[in-house]
Amino acid sequence: GRVHNILDEKPEYAKRLKVTSPILMKEKYDILYSFGDEKSPRYDEYYKNRVFSTTFKSNLKASLEKLASYVIKAVDKDGVSVVILDDRTLSENEKAIPAALAVGYVNQKLLKEGLRHSVSIVAITGEVYDPHMAAVLIGFGCTAIYPYMMFASTVAFFQREKPSKYEMQKLLKNTQKSVNAGILKIMSKMGICTVASYRNSGLFDIIGLSDEIVNDCFTGAHSDLAGLTYSDIEAKINKSHHNAFVEENSMFPLDLGGFYKYSNGGEYHDYGPATTNAMHNKKAAKKEDITDFEG
């Protein structure tokens, strides 16, 4: 909900919804949504929410601008205090805007319009599957996250064991608990002990994104090496989207993307020793040439 001046006390300033974790399970998300849903008996206009799709057909940058303009209008004119960014409208014709770009771009536009204190941002995304991904969204302005794909993966993985309803609920809570622990570990390395203090801190080093994207979405974050532009990212999205929908009902090997630990003699990883050493050497030489990071 809205954040007011802490030096000016009024009863209505206490009207805030509190969650015990930034990672929402479905039940908690449904409760949160019900407070701002005009069709719900729980509805209170102070918690008015609106869902915005974060999918697009073409032109990533223009789609981000359009999304931000809709959000700003809803907050400024319609009194929306909870903005929900949802990528579940993904389909064969609709591609998903990367969650970090959507959250970061909307967050920065709200800041520039002087409206950020009036709204909380909730992300419904399939991209968050580990503590780092969650920390990125929180660090760039997200208040809470409903990682539906992560919980769906937990259900699918353990379904073969035919757990009871109680056991499945416990497994889902353990999944949430593990991500919470990871977020706490990330925050503690920066000497931060509360999510409220970590939110919108931008305490990340950015490698491989153009200055335009950093300025638009991740203002204030430290960027070592420039790289991908909006058009480059859109090309990657198009490729992934094509691979996902190229043939209906077909199953393909899971592409892990090279984010996990390098093992000598094991599978190739994007972030292996050769790549990281090249980045370190390039930074030490104070030279930047995008061609060194292509391919």
Kindly label every feature range from the protein language model.
Residues 87, 106, 137, 194:
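Conserved, mostly hydrophobic/aromatic
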